[in-house]
Amino acid sequence: FQYSNSGKAFLVGAELEVRKNFGFISKQMEDLVFVANMSYIYSRVNLTSVKNNSSDELIRPMQGQSPYIINLGLNYVHPKWGTGASILYNQTGHRLYATGEVGNPAWYEHWRPLLDFQISQKFWKNRGLIRFTISDLIAQKTIFYQNADLGKERQYQKAKDKVVLSQSNFRNYTLQLSFTF
């Protein structure tokens, strides 16, 4: 892979964030909170003016930039007991992993869902905390592919695109114990 800096690039985006507790349903549910954060990002790099450019795409997205990001979550904290729990979902859109050149097209990373769960309990007059986390519950493979349409449709198309790397992902279990003195 070769990297060349471009003199022309453009990026613009919008973000929406929502946070709402469920107290409107009943008083007992006011400690349950829904959170959402969504972003749309449009990025373009123009390589037409780069000398000795061998890229297969002259106008492409910025390397590593997803066109969207979605974060969703449900959080619960019991104020008297010090018990907390959360489930979080994250997804980023497909993104350019490595730029290509003529004869060796760019690699894109296909989006994959991430789902995390966490439960915690305070103790010892709220000075201690034990937390158990399971990260990447879905553990879907990460797929890197070369786009068959060369710049037209960058979304992964299983029937057309060439998978160059399929990487397994695993659940991660964490138990944390902390104290504040």
Language model: regions and residue ranges:
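Extracellular/periplasm-exposed beta-strand and loop segments of Gram-negative cell-envelope proteins
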Residues: 1-9, 43-52, 57-64, 98-100, ...
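Gram-negative outer-membrane beta-barrel transporters
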Residues: 1-95, 178
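Active-site lining segments that contact anionic ligands and/or coordinate catalytic metals
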Residues: 69, 82-84, 112-116, 127-129, ...
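C-terminal beta-signal and adjacent terminal beta-strands/loops
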Residues: 90-99, 121-181
